[in-house]
Amino acid sequence: MLFRSAVNTFSSAIELNPSNPFLYLNRSTTRAEMIDFISSIDNSYQRITIDSDPANRLNNNSKRTYSYDEAVADLNKAVKLFPDFAYAYYNRANLLALSGSLPEAFEDYTKAISLNPAFAEAYYNRGIIQLFMKDTRKGCLDLSKAGELGITEAYEVLKRYASLDN
């Protein structure tokens, strides 16, 4: 209920000031957090079935899918209004990655890094994306850079990843 109220408040503010990119950014964040909250409740609830056929149980227990489309649309607007704001690209990349659009997420992380070369979180996330996209060398380079910029967890990921290769 509070999420919906916050989204409505941001929507009203956008009607009054449609050229403020931060209103779109905040509405996007609120929408994404609302989806994550609802999803976490859904995913923690175990549905019990008496069906003995595993395929039917799998179909009956399949998770709902949630769309970040509205949140991404808000970030598209924020980027259009404030094209030099690295966090808008970063946030959009996060939502694109969660939606499975890895190449598009990679592009947005790259843009965020070009706007803010010390953006450690963007290097970290882009590195993870590159590992998923099977570009191990570049992924490891980005994770290393994230570590240099202060995300020590990046070194742990590199160690675990290296141990998988051996």
For the regions a language model picked out, list residue spans one by one.
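Alpha-helical tetratricopeptide repeat
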Residues: 1-166
